[in-house]
Each structure stands twice: as structure tokens, then as C-alpha cells.
């Protein structure tokens, strides 16, 4: 397989995985801690030797690959909500990479979280609150806010709101990586078959 396409597809799976977790949280108010940790940990890997270093939990990433098959493949069951969130994340990512001050602040704040992890787990409420505030302070104001749909009772809970923002930050991290690896929106239209084929092969590795 083309190594660049494999890496790019891995990063794209990371975006969809985090977005799907946002959707699940918004609807149900809960998310498996291991799955949450797997996505949040990607935020902290800022200087990886290779793409695989960003995604340590390969089992969780399988869900992202399956979402690629569903969203870009021939399935008639495409999730329009996932697509809407994806469009929002990619739009904010473009704004972020054009903002030198935003990128600088983001790196500084992520370093603070890394220091916080000397004392707390990444799924600790204090760490999640910190990650959520990074999204609110730096990302959210760059462009139109992503409107999250779900169960109003769940969405009113502060911890659910914070986890959703933290996961949107994780989706942004994968979006930045995807773009760094040469990912472009037009690939999602004109190179869909290659992306889907790569996702299928990655599922069997």
C-alpha cells in the first residue's frame, strides 16, 4: 500500500472516530473511558516520529476506519450529522493553521496539559476541563461554532459539554495531521475509492 495514503487514511479515521464519540456523548451522556482516553491522548503527541505514534490504541481506531467505509463508500446509510461535524472541523482547522498566534497558544496550552498529567489521568475531570477550555479559548472563536445535536438533558450537563469540547480538540488534532500529510477536501470526492480501499486493508492488518 502507498505509505502516504495509509498514513493520511489513519489520520482521517482519527477525525471521524473523535466526531463519532462527540455524537455518542451528545445522545447518551456517557462514553467508555478507554475510548475517550485513546482520542484525547492524540492531542498530546505533537512531535511524532511517524503517524502511528499518534494513534496508540489501534483497536479503537478500527471504528474510524469503519466510519470511512460508511461515509465514503457505497453505503446508503451515510450519517449526515457526522458529515456536518466533519465539515465544521475541517473549516476550523483551516482557520487555525492560518493563525500563527493561535498555533503558538495551542502549543503552550498543550504543554500545560502534559505537565498536569504528572498528577492526573487524562480522563480526570480537571484535565478534561483544561482540554475543553483550550478548545473554547483558541479554536471555537476562529469561525462558526459547530452546533451539536443530541439529548438536551445530556447536553446540559457540564461534564458532557467539557468532554465534547475536548473531543472536538482531538478531532482538530487529527485534522491538522491529515492536512500535514497532504489531505485535501477534494480527495474526499475524487479519491474516495482509494481512501475506502486503504481503510478496508487497514481493518485487516
UniProtKB/Swiss-Prot annotation:
Compartments in which it is found: Cytoplasm; Cell inner membrane
Keywords: Cell inner membrane, Cell membrane, Cytoplasm, Membrane
Gene name as annotated: hflD
Source organism (scientific name): Shewanella baltica (strain OS185)
Cellular component GO terms, alphabetical: cytoplasm; plasma membrane
Lineage start: Bacteria, Pseudomonadati, Pseudomonadota, Gammaproteobacteria, Alteromonadales
Cytoplasm among keywords: yes
Family per record: Belongs to the HflD family.
Protein name: High frequency lysogenization protein HflD homolog
Topology of the protein relative to the lipid bilayer: Peripheral membrane protein
Principal cellular location given in the protein's record: cytoplasm
